[in-house]
Amino acid sequence: MGLSNRAIIIDGKNHLLGRLASIVAKKLLQGDKVVVLRAEEIVISGNFHRSKLKYMSFLRKRCNINPARGAFHYRAPGKIFWRTVRGMLPHKTNRGNEALKNLRAYEGVPAKYQKTKSLHAPSASRFRLQPRRKFCVVGRLSHEVGWQFQDVVAKLEAKRKVKGAAYFEQKKKMDKLAVQAKKNAAPKIAQYQKIIEALGYN
């Protein structure tokens, strides 16, 4: 069990797939709960066509006797990230399996996480790549190998961003009014403020 029951929320945008997965795997083994948002914006280094050829090769792997036994090929970005993390965990042991249960990866930002702060992992950032290095996003790869909800997620994200921008503008106005109210009240409460500060409070 981790030191806190609260989940670590990470925004997947502009993170490298393998590097972020290794950080998340370590946190899971330490007992933390991890939530990864916007999995479709996670980045894979290298040319897109090379990444697609590698994934198409993976899609051809199956059980000859009965393909329903596996291998199971996930198309959704969240599931691709989940499987990447699974490969970094001892998931066939009880410890690894329990750790994997604490991982959630979502496309877009679900409603319950829209008002929570998300973290960024600098060591897994896309900007660690060389400036001329090519890269592609997992969302595009998923779309081209069979994921059908790219447009749906894009529409929901556009709505969320408009709503978030309106909320931010309203918050700026309220903060400005609060600062002005403190300035207006300062002369009236000056004598009381001196008493409070004399007692050791700010």
Swiss-Prot record:
InterPro entries: Ribosomal_uL13 (IPR005822), Ribosomal_uL13_CS (IPR023563), Ribosomal_uL13_euk/arc (IPR005755), Ribosomal_uL13_sf (IPR036899). PANTHER family: LARGE RIBOSOMAL SUBUNIT PROTEIN UL13, RIBOSOMAL PROTEIN L13. It holds the Pfam family Ribosomal_L13. Keywords: Ribonucleoprotein, Ribosomal protein. Disulfide bonds: none annotated. GO terms for cellular component: cytosolic large ribosomal subunit; ribosome. It comes from the Eukaryota. This is Large ribosomal subunit protein uL13. NCBIfam families: L13_A_E. Belongs to the universal ribosomal protein uL13 family. GO terms for molecular function: mRNA binding; structural constituent of ribosome. SUPFAM superfamilies: Ribosomal protein L13. The gene is rpl-13A. GO terms for biological process: negative regulation of translation; translation.
